[in-house]
Amino acid sequence: MAWLRLQPLTSAFLHFGLVTFVLFLNGLRAEAGDLRDVPSAGQNNESCSGSSDCKEGVILPIWYPENPSLGDKIARVIVYFVALIYMFLGVSIIADRFMASIEVITSQEREVTIKKPNGETSTTTIRVWNETVSNLTLMALGSSAPEILLSLIEVCGHGFIAGDLGPSTIVGSAAFNMFIIIGICVYVIPDGETRKIKHLRVFFVTAAWSVFAYIWLYMILAVFSPGVVQVWEGLLTLFFFPVCVLLAWVADKRLLFYKYMHKRYRTDKHRGIIIETEGEHPKGIEMDGKMMNSHFLDGNLIPLEGKEVDESRREMIRILKDLKQKHPEKDLDQLVEMANYYALSHQQKSRAFYRIQATRMMTGAGNILKKHAAEQAKKTASMSEVHTDEPEDFASKVFFDPCSYQCLENCGAVLLTVVRKGGDISKTMYVDYKTEDGSANAGADYEFTEGTVVLKPGETQKEFSVGIIDDDIFEEDEHFFVRLSNVRVEEEQLEEGMTPAILNSLPLPRAVLASPCVATVTILDDDHAGIFTFECDTIHVSESIGVMEVKVLRTSGARGTVIVPFRTVEGTAKGGGEDFEDTYGELEFKNDETVKTIRVKIVDEEEYERQENFFIALGEPKWMERGISALLLSPEVTDRKLTMEEEEAKRIAEMGKPVLGEHPKLEVIIEESYEFKSTVDKLIKKTNLALVVGTHSWRDQFMEAITVSAAGDEEEDESGEERLPSCFDYVMHFLTVFWKVLFACVPPTEYCHGWACFVVSILIIGMLTAIIGDLASHFGCTIGLKDSVTAVVFVAFGTSVPDTFASKAAALQDVYADASIGNVTGSNAVNVFLGIGLAWSVAAIYWAMQGQEFHVSAGTLAFSVTLFTIFAFVCLSVLLYRRRPHLGGELGGPRGCKLATTWLFVSLWLLYVLFATLEAYCYIKGF
């Protein structure tokens, strides 16, 4: 691993070794030019040797004098080289802002309605941007913006004449990405572990296009119109970009012929190459009121987007459960923060995130995730410490507490409580009350009452009574109302020296009636044994309730002792401790007792969505009366003839017998915990990486720019705690603080959904890229290097270093290999179609309007393209072979296989650079 951590440094030494070797050969050729064959007519000495005559740059002028002494030349080389490195750092930092804006843009969401298999619908949010489309468009543009813009600026800045720097940088960068980056990713995986590409169809499409892109370059340079790029060739090259994106999207969505490929396929077992399909076949989803992609598999309708949402929820629930088991002493807020950091660390991340993370860790800006976790912890702590004082309220609120009362018919009177809350309790307050008929009538069931409640200074509540009239008639429970009105406060008396004007300027104590200002009194008949019932026929409970309590009411009488049996009955929810604990027993209602409670334990399964039911059933009530009523209702008395007096007494006894009421069976529906569900939803929103990498204000950006933070590694710990910055962090921070402060002026990503930052960043990248192109050209001509060699050796390396670190982090942290190597092929294709296609289209159109042709030298570029294409076939073949069962995936595997693959890829890159350099200096015959 130590070699790996020094990989960029090692690669740099290899570069300098190659440069030294080339310069040495160039010197030998200059001294012994007579030993070589005379160049052909189409190949003069100037084209074979690096020109020492520097040309005017797009932005930078020529450094005069043009023929300096050896000492001045060395000084110029050092200045140009240091300036190149510093400009590469600047481009990396502004590209950090650029990629952050892309992450915010591609993270935009919209609401969709998803149909579940049971026909129900639910509303959720999905990303507007398809992952494959964003990777091939904005993500590829973000990671390859310097190469693409360099090609365009070089052509436009030099009078629409083709140059070697831009195209050679694109090809050289493609070689570095394909061989060095993939080689590093293969090696960094721990021994015995593997990573394989998940979206294999998309990888095949982008890999095919990346190889085709360079074959196409050779065709237009050496076959269709050698040395000339026609308008149609440039436009067609540019047009291949949307075609590539479209086909990759089709493969990702399984459209066209892909929709018939429902099953998993594998090749002949003797060959051993396993090709897997990812995910399930997309089903119906209703989006914006219309059904889209409604394909069916096995008769089930399960939307792909819905499945992805469910998977993310299940993963979040699993994380919360695991953390709760590991840290039972933590409260919910602490668990949420830990789960947030864990989910952010382990979720699949975009290419943009890894690029941003790599740049910030290189420049002393710290680990994004740990900084985010620390900020969230500080925010939570500060919120818990801040207590907002409620504004003083001069108005006293007067109301009933409670607002519902129950009493037996023989109670004599019922007491009602009036409460005042808030305001100045040192004042005397008055409030009137009056009874109103409901189903109970004044004079027959209760005594009409009205009056005034006086709350003296310091009193916050007061009681008053209403008389209840008793009778011996069986009747239903009845109710009446008591209403409050005309609340007022005793007026302030004028003190000595106080005028009415001064008194009016003071905040007067006020009083208002608050809800509930009407109380309901229910009179329970005491002449009947009672009707026993639940309050309703259905009740919804949260699975996190623990023990649910259900009331059984005794209405229309409460005379005597009654036993009511009860038991739980299974529905879709199962008893025996699986979903609830089986419960059964008897409730004993004593004389005048009107309410009993049944308790049932609910098992908390911590599910995001849950809806299961069971029932609680009441049995026939048993009257424990031992008087004449029980005797007349006994079977022995029923068999003999009764007298008229006994018949009347039996009829009255039958009327007073306890019975079941309207709701003898209660359905209990167990639902998900609303608190748990909201916690999961909140966590899913908080794990949006756009919130982590994005910025909300210029203040945040400037504070971040001047703050040095520790880099660290995700794999070091899972706590999310920040470490102290190292010496390297401080050095890199002070080296790059100028760029950080300068680029803090870029609009925050929150503005215009990231588009403002996107536009400003790409303009700055274009300007810096133009300067890099001039510096690289002047550096090359100062030491006698051709632009094509400078591009392959220096510029391609400088623009690819952040991608190297990003891919290494992605390979280690992601479960799949898509983010680390899957984007390499797509990025290589996009570089050609956008970088070269756009530049050559503009130049070809310009010269066509002038009535001339756009000339491009086919020699060096065609040779480099051909060489890269051959080596790319070898690289892709090896990656495909590594999917064999005994290796398991493109990355990692047994140590011996890892080393062999890595050395093969590094060797391919070294050979590419060597052959391209030798061809550029005519040691190898090109095309």
From Swiss-Prot:
Binding site for Ca(2+) 4: 445, 471, 475, 478
Membrane topology listed for this record: Multi-pass membrane protein
Keyword presence, Plastid: no
Region (Putative calmodulin-binding region), start-end ranges: 253-272
Entry comment describing in which tissues the protein is expressed: Detected in neurons in brain cortex and hippocampus. Detected in pyramidal cell bodies and processes, in granule cells and interneurons in the CA1 and CA3 region of the hippocampus. Detected on astrocyte processes in brain cortex. Detected on endothelial cells in hippocampus capillaries (at protein level). Restricted to brain and skeletal muscle.
Keyword Metal-binding: yes
Alphabetical UniProt keywords: Antiport, Calcium, Calcium transport, Calmodulin-binding, Cell junction, Cell membrane, Cell projection, Cytoplasm, Endoplasmic reticulum, Glycoprotein, Ion transport, Membrane, Metal-binding, Mitochondrion, Mitochondrion outer membrane, Repeat, Signal, Sodium, Sodium transport, Synapse, Transmembrane, Transmembrane helix, Transport
Binding site residues for Ca(2+) 6: 579, 606-607
Residues engaged in binding Ca(2+) 1: 409, 445, 471, 475
Residues given in the record as Ca(2+) 3 binding sites: 409, 471, 473, 475, 525, 527
Designated name of the protein: Sodium/calcium exchanger 3
GO molecular function annotations of the record: calcium:monoatomic cation antiporter activity; calcium:monoatomic cation antiporter activity involved in regulation of postsynaptic cytosolic calcium ion concentration; calcium:sodium antiporter activity; calmodulin binding; metal ion binding
Family: Belongs to the Ca(2+):cation antiporter (CaCA) (TC 2.A.19) family. SLC8 subfamily.
Catalytic activity: Ca(2+)(in) + 3 Na(+)(out) = Ca(2+)(out) + 3 Na(+)(in)
GO CC, one annotated term: cytosol
Domain notes: The cytoplasmic Calx-beta domains bind the regulatory Ca(2+). The first Calx-beta domain can bind up to four Ca(2+) ions. The second domain can bind another two Ca(2+) ions that are essential for calcium-regulated ion exchange.
Renumbered ranges of Alpha- repeats: 140-180, 796-832
